[in-house]
Amino acid sequence: TTTVQYNPSEQYQPYPEQQEPFVQQQPFVQQQQQPFVQQQQMFLQPLLQQQLNPCKQFLVQQCSPVAVVPFLRSQILRQAICQVARQQCCRQLAQIPEQLRCPAIHSVVQAIILQQQQQQQFFQPQLQQQVFQPQLQQVFNQPQQQAQFEGMRAFALQALPAMCDVYVPPQCPVATAPLGGF
């Protein structure tokens, strides 16, 4: 006679577990419609912005007519800062692959505008916001900010490549990208 010994390590399941039907999330075809370059930009934008920090510095430090700085520095100090920022900016811009230079410059301008917006909001007296309707104010500010952004972007796309003697493709794929913060 054979005796069946109960082994506690073996687990007996009276019924096989019901497997949930596999739920397809999104068909892969939809994802492919987005151009590869755009996908690259989404991942690389923070990286590019960091890499082009000297260019941001250059544009903000009143090294160019487009920059607006609330306080004045001595001319010599500013020239020295601008020269260093310019050299670093050009070095970094040259290292960025050609097809990514335009989105890189775009993201730098975006960062400058957002920074300026935050500064304006910070310095804006609270009393003024209570007197005027905030919704009304936003409606009037938006086209102005969009125009400011477009102006600075157009300037940066001309000035930086010319100054650094690097090629930036004339077709900028991110020209219609909405600006964050609106």
Curated annotation (Swiss-Prot):
Sequence repeat locations: 21-26, 27-34, 35-41
Pfam family, one: Gliadin
Entry GO MF terms: nutrient reservoir activity
Keyword Repeat in record: yes
GO CC, alphabetical: aleurone grain; vacuole
Domain of life: Eukaryota
Main location: other
Intracellular or extracellular location(s): Vacuole, Aleurone grain
InterPro entries listed in its UniProt record: Bifun_inhib/LTP/seed_sf (IPR036312), Bifunc_inhib/LTP/seed_store (IPR016140), Glia_glutenin (IPR001954)
Entry-linked CDD domains: AAI_SS
Function: Seed storage protein. Serves as a source of nitrogen, carbon, and sulfur for the young developing seedling.
Quaternary structure note: Monomer.
Family: Belongs to the gliadin/glutenin family.
Name by which UniProt lists this protein: Avenin-E
Species per Swiss-Prot/TrEMBL record: Avena sativa (Oat)
